[in-house]
């Protein structure tokens, strides 16, 4: 990004993530969405992220392994493959809909936007971790998450809640 956030860029990046279906139980689909996130994030971040595997599952990381501030999210969804045929990504006024928009691909894009504003500052120690097993309880990534947050002063979970409240824990 050029230092200016544009709503069209946020919507377009969300659309691109949503149109890569990623049900938790489909490892190939989860690997594909991690690849898509890796490519999309390059437009937002000053340094590239990295794709890793943990517990047999793909994850995406950006920044130091133990950042002061960690943005935590996931790229898997509860929606089965083929859902996009019935419920396509759509924008109606100021509302985006489609499988994974709310939980939580729009939050991932918002995280990249936030990082784009701080990632150029050398004193900032921010990182991001995106897993692909949250919808089934984060069993494979639990140790990775625990390790990542150990030295962090703050962890911000990018997943929204239905009533707009701040989430303070994760499955």
Give, region by region, the residue ranges found by the protein language model.
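Acidic/histidine-rich catalytic neighborhood of metal-dependent amide-processing enzymes
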Residues: 104-171
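Acidic/His- and Gly-rich active-site-bordering loop/insert found
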Residues: 2-101, 122
């Amino acid at each position: 990004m050029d230092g200016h956030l544009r709503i069209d860029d946020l919507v377009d990046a969300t659309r691109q993530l949503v149109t890569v279906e990623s049900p938790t139980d489909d490892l190939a689909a989860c690997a594909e969405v991690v690849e898509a996130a890796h490519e999309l994030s390059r437009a937002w971040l000053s340094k590239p992220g990295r794709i890793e595997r943990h517990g047999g599952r793909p994850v995406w990381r950006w920044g130091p392994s133990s950042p002061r501030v960690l943005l935590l999210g996931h790229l898997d969804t509860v929606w089965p493959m083929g859902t996009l045929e019935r419920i396509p990504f759509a924008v109606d006024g100021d509302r985006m809909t489609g499988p994974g928009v709310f939980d939580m691909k729009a939050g991932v894009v918002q995280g990249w936007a936030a990082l784009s504003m701080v990632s150029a500052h050398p004193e900032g120690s921010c990182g991001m971790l995106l897993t692909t097993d949250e919808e089934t309880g984060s069993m494979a990534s639990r140790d990775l998450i625990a390790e990542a947050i150990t030295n962090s002063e703050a962890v911000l979970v990018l997943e929204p809640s239905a009533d707009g409240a701040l989430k303070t824990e994760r499955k």
